[in-house]
Amino acid sequence: MGTANLHDSTNKPLYGERIIEESNIICFENPNKKRIYEISIELPEFTCKCPFSGYPDFAKLNIYYQPNMKVYELKSLKLYINKFRDLKISHEEVVNRIMDDLLKAAVPHWIHLNADFNPRGNVSMKLDIYSGQKRN
């Protein structure tokens, strides 16, 4: 078994970085298409960078959705979300991009994406985006 060389100064991506970079949202078939049900997913460690200062922004993302034909696979979703860690992007743009990718991957009946950004400089921000018609 090999050991990590902590003094390796090459710019070669580490295995975790490669996996994150190559990741996409994967879905699997909804196991019960006849039933209307709601799934909630919490991603409490979302990060991206402020496009103006370069400082990190931290948020908790909550996804609530009613699946149609497909359901999100959680590990792929986690890896996909990690892609934004070093990206300089506004709160509004990143949340809309995530919503677009969620809609493209699974086409749920209804989805709500909530982003609760941590306060920075005495200012906090919450974003909510909805798509589709919630069913009862």
UniProtKB/Swiss-Prot annotation:
Coiled-coil annotated spans: none
Chain segments annotated as transmembrane: none
Pathway stated in the Swiss-Prot or TrEMBL entry: tRNA modification; tRNA-queuosine biosynthesis
Pfam families: QueF
Cytoplasm is among the record's keywords: yes
Entry's Gene Ontology BP terms: queuosine biosynthetic process; tRNA modification
Active site: 50 (thioimide intermediate), 57 (proton donor)
Domain of life: Bacteria
Residues reported in the UniProt entry to bind substrate: 72-74, 91-92
Gene Ontology CC annotations of this record: cytoplasm
Subcellular localization: Cytoplasm
EC number: 1.7.1.13
The reaction(s) this protein catalyses: 7-aminomethyl-7-carbaguanine + 2 NADP(+) = 7-cyano-7-deazaguanine + 2 NADPH + 3 H(+)
Keyword vocabulary terms for this entry: Cytoplasm, NADP, Oxidoreductase, Queuosine biosynthesis
UniProt keyword NADP present: yes
Record function comment: Catalyzes the NADPH-dependent reduction of 7-cyano-7-deazaguanine (preQ0) to 7-aminomethyl-7-deazaguanine (preQ1).
Protein family membership: Belongs to the GTP cyclohydrolase I family. QueF type 1 subfamily.
HAMAP family cross-referenced by the UniProt entry: QueF_type1
Name this protein carries in UniProt: NADPH-dependent 7-cyano-7-deazaguanine reductase
Source organism phylogeny: Bacteria, Bacillati, Cyanobacteriota, Cyanophyceae, Synechococcales
Gene name of the encoded protein: queF
